[in-house]
Curated annotation (Swiss-Prot):
It comes from the Bacteria. Binds 1 FMN per subunit. Belongs to the dihydroorotate dehydrogenase family. Type 1 subfamily. This is Dihydroorotate dehydrogenase B (NAD(+)), catalytic subunit. Gene3D superfamilies: Aldolase class I. The lineage of its organism: Bacteria, Bacillati, Bacillota, Bacilli, Bacillales. The gene is pyrD.
């Protein structure tokens, strides 16, 4: 028995560890360090219909417990991803999750329709929560009706299950999650980065050229845990949890909150081996905690509460 096997819509994962979109590129750099086939899946970098060069520099800044980024969805565009990046990834035993982005609804639909045809793309991640672009991105993810409409339109053209990436920069994330579920989403990924800023002590001006950026890393983990905990009790579709994961213990905490798999982001920049290390350490941690299979951890924090009432 594979104690780490996870079954999700469109995704049969040998383990629940997935490098997060935007922190792993298309895997080429990390393939120099280890065989990517050990991973559960890869969420590839956000893909738009046309190439994007991203925001002006500087667009990354360190913060205590994390980092700010304002990359701006830099990517080579749909044609290059379809004809170069995805074919290259076929050498690995991996179901790919393609992250889809755009400036308007029609862009999302066009990219989703084409990229979902790729033989190794088993699911889409609808990026409606990027805080670092002026159009699209987070504009779609802060309004339940708009988020639901976009989800429905993408579902109509996609040949694979659709997961929607939620923004934490909202007043009521549960309301948005439920609207997206009603619109037909197959799953959720959460959370994207928190909007933040740093100022230069000498100039008193923002360090990032974009002024603001997305905060990621361990600093946001408690927020992510709280939101996964809330949303998982309100919806009946699976959640891929993310936000500050660095260790096997972090993974179990997300599972306890209600996640069915996890994505590791910023930690990949610090330690390129973080994902295989977590995968290697999980079985011993399950033994220590008394679990036969990782699925036994899912939702344990609130399911225990329900059973005790």
């Amino acid at each position: 028995m594979n104690r780490l096997q996870v079954e999700l819509p469109g995704l049969s994962l040998k383990n629940p560890i997935i490098p997060a979109s935007g922190c792993f590129g298309f895997g080429r750099e990390y393939a120099q360090f280890y065989d990517l086939s050990v991973l559960g899946s890869i969420m590839i970098k956000a893909t738009t219909e046309q190439p994007r060069y991203g925001n002006p520099t500087p667009r990354v800044a360190e913060t205590p417990g994390g980092m700010l980024n304002a990359i701006g969805l830099q990517n080579p565009g749909l044609d290059k991803v379809m004809n170069s990046e995805l074919p290259w990834l076929e050498q690995f035993d991996l179901p790919i999750i393609a992250n889809v982005a755009g400036s308007q609804a029609e862009d999302y639909v066009a990219v989703a329709k084409e990229i979902s045809k790729a033989p190794n793309v088993h699911a889409l991640e609808l990026n409606i929560s990027c805080p670092n672009v002026k159009t699209g991105g987070i504009a779609f993810g802060t309004n339940p009706e708009i988020a639901a409409d976009l989800t429905k339109r993408v579902k109509e053209v996609s040949e694979v299950p659709v997961y929607v990436k939620l923004s934490p920069n909202v007043a009521n994330i549960v309301e948005i999650a439920k609207a997206i579920e009603t619109a037909g989403a197959d799953g959720l990924t959460m959370i994207n980065t928190l909007l933040g800023m740093r100022l230069d002590l000498k100039t008193a001006k923002p360090i990032l050229a974009n002024r603001t950026g997305g905060l990621s890393g361990p600093a946001i983990k408690p927020v992510a845990i709280r939101m996964v905990h809330e949303v998982s009790q309100a919806v009946n579709i699976p959640i891929i949890g993310m936000g500050g994961i660095e260790t096997a213990e972090d993974v179990i905490e997300f599972f306890y909150a209600g996640a069915s798999a996890v994505a590791v982001g910023t930690a990949n920049f610090i330690d390129p081996f973080v994902c295989p290390t977590i995968i290697e350490e999980l079985p011993a941690l399950l033994d220590e905690l008394g679990f036969d299979h990782i699925s036994e951890c899912q939702g344990r924090s609130w399911k225990q509460t329900c059973h005790s009432r």
